[in-house]
Curated annotation (Swiss-Prot):
Name of the gene encoding the protein in the UniProt record: panC
Enzyme class, broadest EC rank: ligase
Enzyme Commission number(s) from the entry: 6.3.2.1
Species of origin: Pelagibacter ubique (strain HTCC1062)
PANTHER family: CYTIDYLATE KINASE/PANTOATE-BETA-ALANINE LIGASE, PANTOATE--BETA-ALANINE LIGASE
Binding locations of ATP: 36-43, 152-155, 180, 188-191
Entry's family note: Belongs to the pantothenate synthetase family.
The protein, known as: Pantothenate synthetase
InterPro entries: Pantoate_ligase, Pantoate_ligase_C, Rossmann-like_a/b/a_fold
Subunit structure: Homodimer.
Gene Ontology MF term list: ATP binding; pantoate-beta-alanine ligase activity
Additional record remark: The reaction proceeds by a bi uni uni bi ping pong mechanism.
Length: 280
């Protein structure tokens, strides 16, 4: 039997799949916000957007082991369940889903594989990461059947892949919400709590430099590769970071064809052993 742990704000506990279905069957305008906990203002934006557009909102908190290609990252991922539940209660979330690993992975993973053209950006450096993301969200959507799901723009490649996969398989629409940033322009992330003071400050400076680069590329796309090269050299030299990638990609298909097309500047780097990603 498939057991679940669902905490309602009234602290009503639902253990069975059938009970979950009964709880949400009258709420077909259900909005779903998947998270891994350590909630912040970025998650708040997703939740508020869901509440504005859906009758009820369900938030999941599940640190998914299959999307980590580094066991150390999984073990050290920030965990603040007590604070998260208090935060969600203040936001008046209708349902909070807290599954265990066994409850999610009670059956064998689906064979989800990225094609060659999709193995770019984070997929190039984090083997199996997006397959893990797609697998866990596939299970969530199959179980919950939300009308809409909300994701953050900071993880744009993830949003792009999830939207294509989920909308081709289910009746759930996947929506993206704008990135929320710290005062120093660093994108809000649960990983920010792992940064020391110096790394936090430097990451903010890096974000500002990347935003400036994006604006310069808009004015002169022909020389964008050279502009990226010089900034990579500057950042690596002055901020003691290891850059995995810094690339411009078409926002419609993530191709490198950005001439006369809308585009984003994507970055992933390590600073003080903490991996950060962003896009502008």
């Amino acid at each position: 039997m498939f057991y679940l742990l669902i905490f309602l704000l009234q602290m009503k506990l639902i253990k069975l799949k059938t009970d979950l279905i009964k709880a949400i069957e009258l709420d077909r305008r259900l909005g779903f916000v998947p998270t891994m906990g350590s909630l912040h203002e970025g998650h708040k934006t997703l939740i508020k957007t869901s509440q504005k557009n859906c009758k009820k909102t369900l938030v999941s908190i599940f640190i998914n082991p299959t999307q980590f290609n580094n066991k150390k990252d999984y073990k050290t991922y920030p965990k603040n369940l007590k604070q998260d539940l208090s935060y969600l209660k203040k936001l008046k979330v209708d349902y909070v889903y807290l599954p265990t690993i066994k409850q999610i992975y009670w059956k064998k993973n689906n064979e989800i594989k990225l094609n060659k053209s999709q193995k770019i950006l984070c997929a190039k450096f984090r083997k199996g990461h997006f397959e893990g993301v797609l697998n866990v969200l596939d299970r969530f959507i199959e179980l919950i059947s939300p009308q809409k799901m909300f994701m953050g723009e900071k993880d744009f490649q993830q949003f792009f892949l999830v939207k294509n996969y989920i909308e081709n398989k289910y009746n759930t629409k996947v929506h993206v919400c704008k990135t929320v940033r710290e005062k120093n322009k660093l994108a809000l992330s649960s990983r920010n709590s792992l940064l020391n003071k110096k790394s936090f400050i430097n990451s903010g400076i890096i974000a500002k430099k990347l935003l400036s680069l994006k604006n310069e590329i808009k004015k002169n796309k022909k020389n964008y590769k050279k502009m990226i090269f010089y900034l990579k050299e500057e950042l690596s030299k002055n901020f003691d970071i290891k850059i995995e990638y810094l690339e411009c990609r078409n926002t419609h298909n993530l191709s490198t064809n950005i001439m006369n097309k809308p585009f984003k500047l994507f970055v992933a780097y390590y600073i003080n052993n903490v991996r950060l990603i962003d896009n502008f």
